[in-house]
Amino acid sequence: DDWTDAHRCASLALVELDKADELLAQQGDAVMNQLVCFVANQWKKHYDRPDERVVCRLTDTLFAIGCADKTCAELAEELRGIYAEMPRECVASVGLMRRVAFTQSIGCACTGEVRGKNWDALYKLCEERLAAAKTAGGDQVCAG
């Protein structure tokens, strides 16, 4: 609420590792934990500024990114640029060192797309867009 009171809008993105269950089955818990930490650190490089940008882990493989003063289109463009430059492999150092390939799907939305300060509706819209990105094959940003 502070963001929407102090800024023109706020945007939210949900970011999830694609095929996480398959990765877990193939790689095991220890490698998966290392992969999730690697991914989290990649996003934290860009979105760990509490006054205007924040990233947090919601579940084992799901992250939320929030930005003040960005529309959905602006956040989506920024996310696409960052994701395009992000490594798509993590060097797992558990057991024998090996590269673990991964992709991510992202769904984002803006407070301007929902009525009032309805955070539940904003989250639901992000979930729908994340599902659309995954349904379309993953490895992409869906912004509506």
Report residues per predicted region.
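Short catalytic/binding micro-motifs of nucleotide second-messenger systems
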Residues: 45-51, 83-98, 132
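Regulatory/sensor and coupling segments of signal-transduction and defense proteins
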Residues: 130, 134, 138
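A generic structural signal for alpha-helix starts
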Residues: 30, 70-73, 114-117
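Residue-level recognition of strand-loop junctions within catalytic nucleotide-signaling folds
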Residues: 25, 66-70, 87, 109-112
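Conserved long alpha-helical elements within nucleotide-processing catalytic cores of c-di-GMP signaling
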Residues: 1-12, 18-45, 56-60, 73-80, ...
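A short glycine-enriched loop-to-beta-strand structural element that forms part of the catalytic core
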Residues: 11, 56-62, 66, 92-128, ...
